[in-house]
Amino acid sequence: MTVGVFAALGEEVARVRECLGGVGTERAGLTFYVVSVGALQVVYVCGGVGKVNAALCTQLLISEFGARVLINTGIAGALDERLCVFDVLVSVDAVQHDVDVTAFGYQKGRIPRMDSVEWTANTALRYLVREAFDLCTRDPEWTEGACALSGSGDPPSRVSRLVEGRVASGDLFVSDAQTRARIIREFGAHGVEMEGAAFAHVASVNGVPFVIIRCISDGAGAEQDVSMSYKEFSTRAARRSALLTLRVLERLSALRTSVVASLFPMVVV
């Protein structure tokens, strides 16, 4: 079985490359790294920021490399008050907060001719992420540099938290309270970033199970200076997301073929 891993930024995939290596293959000006992890073939790519780049990479992972399970790893801004810097958001579903065709009677976020606003993540993959997270929290590399979101009142040593919820994506970096409040009000999202929903859209229309893993890097406009928070925490948050992704790959590689077939019935193994 081939698992595709997409990240937007170099720091979001750096730890994966350190651990897995792989042979680079060029497609559309991007380098896709192919490597065996147990019985799995893993293909991972740093594809660039934004929804178009996410869609491009996701389709290439499916069409060119035969990915039958997809993981999007990276960082996000927190919209849920339970989430602090270095906590983890795992997608229940994903929406595009910058799509607006309401002038023609469509619900905010809904693309014409699509059945719904949201793209739903695979339940079995979410379970594997939760299992992997439990393992990560016992890893010294994971706990190094733990810190709560500035102003939250939580001590720097607080235990990392995993929250499952809605990921909202759009082609803008959310850094002001007004935009933040709008996304929460209109979509009930738990975190915001710039790629996940496009990744989820392409995975879904191809019938490929997916999950989005996001480590929180900032408060998406909740703090006084979001750019300062992002610059300070993004690299470490990205590393955590990559560590969690590696653990998920380990869990997937340990599954028997019969188990994979039962968990992902549409997957050819």
From Swiss-Prot:
Q: Name one GO cellular component term.
A: cytosol
- What are the GO MF terms of this UniProt record? adenosylhomocysteine nucleosidase activity; methylthioadenosine nucleosidase activity
Q: Name one GO biological process term.
A: L-methionine salvage from methylthioadenosine
Cysteines engaged in disulfide bonds, as pairs: none
Q: In the Enzyme Commission scheme, what number(s) does this protein have?
A: 3.2.2.9
Give the reaction(s) catalysed. Answer: S-adenosyl-L-homocysteine + H2O = S-(5-deoxy-D-ribos-5-yl)-L-homocysteine + adenine; S-methyl-5'-thioadenosine + H2O = 5-(methylsulfanyl)-D-ribose + adenine; 5'-deoxyadenosine + H2O = 5-deoxy-D-ribose + adenine
Q: Which family does it belong to?
A: Belongs to the PNP/UDP phosphorylase family. MtnN subfamily.
Q: What function does this protein fulfil?
A: Catalyzes the irreversible cleavage of the glycosidic bond in both 5'-methylthioadenosine (MTA) and S-adenosylhomocysteine (SAH/AdoHcy) to adenine and the corresponding thioribose, 5'-methylthioribose and S-ribosylhomocysteine, respectively. Also cleaves 5'-deoxyadenosine, a toxic by-product of radical S-adenosylmethionine (SAM) enzymes, into 5-deoxyribose and adenine.
For this entry, the protein name equals: 5'-methylthioadenosine/S-adenosylhomocysteine nucleosidase
Quote the gene name from the UniProt entry.
Answer: mtnN
